[in-house]
Amino acid sequence: MTNIRKSHPLMKIINDAFVDLPAPSNISSWWNFGSLLGVCLILQILTGLFLAMHYTPDTLTAFSSVTHICRDVNYGWVIRYMHANGASIFFICLFTHVGRGLYYGSYTFLETWNIGVILLLTTMATAFMGYVLPWGQMSFWGATVITNLLSAIPYIGTDLVEWIWGGFSVDKATLTRFFAFHFILPFVITALAIVHLLFLHETGSNNPTGIPSNADKIPFHPYYTIKDILGILLLMTTLLTLTLFAPDLLGDPDNYTPANPLSTPPHIKPEWYFLFAYAILRSIPNKLGGVLALALSILILALIPMLHTSKQRSLMFRPLSQCLFWALIADLLTLTWIGGQPVEHPFIIIGQVASILYFLLILVLMPVAGIIENKLLKW
């Protein structure tokens, strides 16, 4: 008799994706982050659902409703802080997942990579709108500053901003629509993640060497299920430690002050995971130029497959490109630090140098390094 997991129409899909899937025998812990992102997404949807049961998307009561969740709802504070810190863990996993793809040349799976870039953009949009919902000072001013950037678009800019706001400033209409979008987008992300997996399973996983591994495959279960469970345990330990011991470590103190349109905070900045892009935006003195650089800092990922010049897929055997890759990581950490600093000397010039270096590394230095390494192969 055929096993039910191989014959039942629904079980068969799950079986082919998570049980009998042929996987390379040598994929390292850097390949754990896909499953961790899935866990993060489920966790965010569940905690978000329970928060939405008590939250009111209204300018007069939003801040109070979040306070009510933390003070009066049974374990409401745990749910609220798991959701807020869950977003930070989500982005740590996202950036690591993208970094892994860059390092090992996984971007040569074009469809999977492009869906991944769309997933990243959608997740960033969702996180931004979620940050507005508690209606604290940084929520309000963050929303005002970031949405106002669209006014830099020639001709339609101002109309576009007022259309997004639903009025002449960030107000009740903005909060209501942001709540609606923040609620629906995670389900869009889930659908995109399924498509992402679908495309990945068309080609099979990449591996650290970048060499086809068809000759040496092992079943996903039990080898990688047990490996994923270890990753999930470490993820949950990190999240719970953060939530229970330092829930406000990654937040902004200004968000404990209710939103006040008449008082601007001294330093407006987004959540830490957007600081690198915010630093690039601020490093250009022209508004439209800054907005374009901001958009390009993320969209440049879609160009990566076209910038691949090496005959080898992975960076595993390419020391020159490895040095440039880690220089890029250091540069991104520098940009993240600068994004959280005030706009004054010496931070302005550091931000400008780091921004130029970011684009220079991706667009020029890494492709050139690939060509040099090709020459060294013949040497």
UniProtKB/Swiss-Prot annotation:
Binding site for heme b b566: H97, H196
Localization: Mitochondrion inner membrane
One Pfam family cited in the UniProt record for this chain: Cytochrom_B_C
Topological category with respect to the lipid bilayer: Multi-pass membrane protein
SUPFAM superfamilies tied to this protein: a domain/subunit of cytochrome bc1 complex (Ubiquinol-cytochrome c reductase), Transmembrane di-heme cytochromes
Function: Component of the ubiquinol-cytochrome c reductase complex (complex III or cytochrome b-c1 complex) that is part of the mitochondrial respiratory chain. The b-c1 complex mediates electron transfer from ubiquinol to cytochrome c. Contributes to the generation of a proton gradient across the mitochondrial membrane that is then used for ATP synthesis.
Protein family membership: Belongs to the cytochrome b family.
Name under which the protein is recorded: Cytochrome b
UniProt source species: Hippopotamus amphibius (Hippopotamus)
Originating gene: MT-CYB
